[in-house]
Amino acid sequence: MKRTVIVGALLAVGAVGAMLRAQQPPPSPEASARQADLILSNGKIITVDERFTIAQAVAIRGDRIVAVGTNQEIARLAGASTRRVDLMGKAVIPGLIDNHMHLLRAGTTWVKELRFDGVESRKKAIELIQARAKALGPGEWVFNIGGWAHQQFADDPKPFTRDELDQIAPNNPVALQESYYQVFLNSRGLKAFGIEENVPDPTDFVKGSIMRDAAGKPTGIIKGDIAATRPVAARLPKVEANELEASSAALVADMNRAGLTSFGVAGCNADVLEIFQKWKAQGHLNVRTFCIGGAAASTPEQADRSIQQIAQMKLFQGDDYIDNVFFGESVYQPLHDPMFALKSNPRPDQLEQWRRMAMAIAKAGLPLHVHAELHDTIDAFLDQIEAVNKEHSIRNLRWTLAHVNQINAPQLERMKKLGMYAAVHPWAVINGGIMHEGFGDGAYDMPALATIQASGIMWGFGTDATAANQYLPFTTLAFAVTGKMPGGLKVIKQTISREDALIAHTRKNAFLVFHEDDLGAIQPGKLADLLVLDRDYLTIPADQIKDIKPTMTMVGGRIVYDSINAAQPKIVRIPSERR
C-alpha cells in the first residue's frame, strides 16, 4: 500500500492533552462562518482516503470534517470559540465499522453476561468467573453466550469440565457458551436445566447434544452447533424490561470503548431499536445502526407470503444514524448452513424456493445480504443468483454474500462478474482451533484473505458477534495481519497488509452499508467519526495490534468515549450541519 505523507516529523506518542481554548482576536463574520468548532492537531492522522494520506491535523465543524492537513493549515480555521485537542503525536484513524453484528440482540443480555472477548489466559477467565459469582451472590447465573473459545487461553487451552466449574463457582449455576460449538455447565447449571443422571433429556434439546459418560452421568457439555446451543441461550436470564435501556447503554459504551462507531446489524431487535430511536431524538445515540432484515421463510407457504411482502418493502427511509439497508441475512431458512458443518447439502426443492424469493428481491430492486458459509452453499447460491440476474439485473444492488469462510478464487470471479460484494467474517479469530479439528489443513485458508484481497472484489470485515465471534475490532485486524488467534495460535496462512485490513474495516465497509459518501475515511465533508489510539497502528509490531486501545472515540463530532474520563464519557454536543 502506497502512503502519501504530507507532514514532516511527528511528535512522540503521549497522553491526549486537555482541550485548549484558542486565543485569537475576535473573528470577522466571514471568518466565523469558516472557523472550526474543534481542532485535533499535532498528531498522525491516518486518513484511509484513496491515497492513504497521512496528515497532522483535522478540523471539525458541526458533525462533519471540514479540513485535513498540516498543523499550520488547520490552525487557520481556529477562532475564538474553537476547542482544541493536542494529540501529542498520537495516531488517529476513522471510526471502525463492523458490517455484520447482532448488536441489538446483545442488548437483551449484555449486563447479565460475563464476556471473555480478548481474554488470553485461562487463569484470568477463572478469576472473572469467581469475581462474578461473588458479586452476584449464591444462586445467580454466571454465564456468557459465546464470543470465545478455549483455544484462546495461551496458558492452558483446554475445555472447562463440570467438576472444575463446580470448584470455581460452587454456589452458582454456570453456563459458558463457546461460540456456537458447545456449552460448559457445572452441576447447578445442569440441574437448573433438568439435565440429570437417570433422567431423560429435556425435549427441547437436540437429540444427542447432551454429553454423558459411560455410566450415563452428564459431563456438563452440550455440543452440536447452533441448534444444540440455542436451547441453553433461550433458558438463560435476559434483562427485565425496565433494565433494557441500561443494558443497551452498557453495550454501546463497550462498543465505543473498543473503537466501533457503525454497524451493519443483523436482526434489529424492535425493543432495543426503539431505545436507539429515543436516544437519537435526544441527540445522544453514540453508534450508527444500519439494519439487515426482512421476511425470511421456512416453508413454501411462507415463501409465498414473503414474496408478497418483499414487493412492498421499502429501504433507505432513515438517516445516517438509523436506517434499513439490506434484505437478509436469511432468505429461505432451510438453506442456512451451520458454521461448524463439514459439508452442506442444499436440496433442489429448497434452492427453488430460495430462487423464487431472490427473484422477488431483485425485481423489487432491493439489496441482499445473505448468509453463505461453506463452499457448496456459496456455489449453489451463485447458481441461483446467476439465474436471477438473467431476468433482473442485480449489478447495482450491492448483493452481498456474508461470512464466506470457505470462498475460493473461482467463486470470487463469479461474484465480480455479477457486481457482487463480500462481507467477510473470519470465525477463525476465535474458532480457528475448532475449525482445524474439523477441516484439517484446509482451515489454513478459512478465510482466504489474500485471495479475497487479490481478487479485486469490494469486501469488508465484520464479526457476526456477539455469539458466533468476539467483537473487538483490533483483535480482528491483528488476526488479518498475523493469522493468529488471541493467545497466539496460528490458524490461517493467507494474511494481508495492515493497510488493507484497516481499509476493509473502514472505507470499504462504509460502501457495504451504503454510506461511502459519509463514513470510512477522515476527509472533508465526511462525518466526524474517528478514534485517537494509544499506539501507532502502522508501526507497532504486528503481534501488538490486538492490544491497541482507543483513548478517545468520536461520533459525529461528539466525544463518546474518553479514557481519561472513562467512567463518565465526555459528550460534546455540536449542532448538526448538513452539506
Label each residue range with its predicted role.
Residues M1-A9:
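Bacterial N-terminal signal peptides that target proteins for export
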Residues G8-G17:
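Bacterial N-terminal signal peptides
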Residues L20-A22:
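Boundary at the C-terminal end of the N-terminal hydrophobic targeting segment
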Residues Q24-S41, I46, E50-A311, D320-T377, ...:
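Divalent metal-binding segments
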Residues L315-Q317:
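Accessory "access/gating" subregions that flank catalytic or transport cores
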Residues M359-H369, E373-W399, H403-V404, A409-E413, ...:
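His/Asp/Glu-enriched, well-ordered alpha-helical/loop segment
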Residues Y421:
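Ligand-binding beta-strand-loop-alpha-helix segment within the catalytic cores
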Residues D562-S576:
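Glycine- and charge-enriched low-complexity intrinsically disordered segments
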